[in-house]
Amino acid sequence: MLTKLILVRHAESTWNQTGRYQGRIDTELSDQGQKQASLLAERLQSVPVAAIYASPLRRALHTAITIGVAQNMDIRVEPDLTEIDHGAWNGLLPDEVEKRFGPLLQQWLVSPSKVQMPGGESLVDVSRRATTVLSRILADHSGGTVVVCTHDAVLKVLIADIIGMHLDRFWSFGICNASISIVECNQGSNRLLCLNDTCHLGPYRTETDEQAL
């Protein structure tokens, strides 16, 4: 039975504006992010949705709530959709990470699957928890359309798993704030229909360096 998965990255946060590594830090949406969330909700308003799932972090949850209001639907919070834990990198700017963790940062940019964040997670950790919860979501809503609102790293590892891509190609594509990626799932056969669609944002699209998650 065909199930459609709409993968959404949260709208722009205050720390997306400054480029800080957010990880598990619970940042708010920026003013532009709130506008992005409204445009995203407008884009999805006519789509018949069976359920909306979100990370508990406010930047994702508030994005999902905006979609949910347009759909007249409550949000289902899933802790395993939370962003990667950057550990000691949380709250730092990229140049601060480079000064303190230069060799590890270079490995993160070249071979990200092999990096264990100091005091945090690895991409393998994130992939394990995120793919497990996604399998459960798909099983619970077979034949329907489900929105999953989460974070950059989580979306990248999920898409990598869906298309059979190695985690070391993590930097091969970007996922913008308030973007949509759509996957059709049919009894274990998955098809990526679109990736990082931001046409609904117009001039409100965030143009930032995606390396600071």
What are these regions (language model features)?
Residues S38-Q106:
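Phosphate-coordination/substrate-recognition cap region in phosphate-metabolizing enzymes
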Residues M1-K4, M73, I84-K99, A139, ...:
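Acidic, low-complexity terminal tails and accessory targeting/binding regions
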Residues T66, V157, D161:
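Active-site signature of alpha/beta-hydrolase-fold catalytic machinery across serine-
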Residues Q107-V110, Q116:
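A charged, well-structured terminal subsegment
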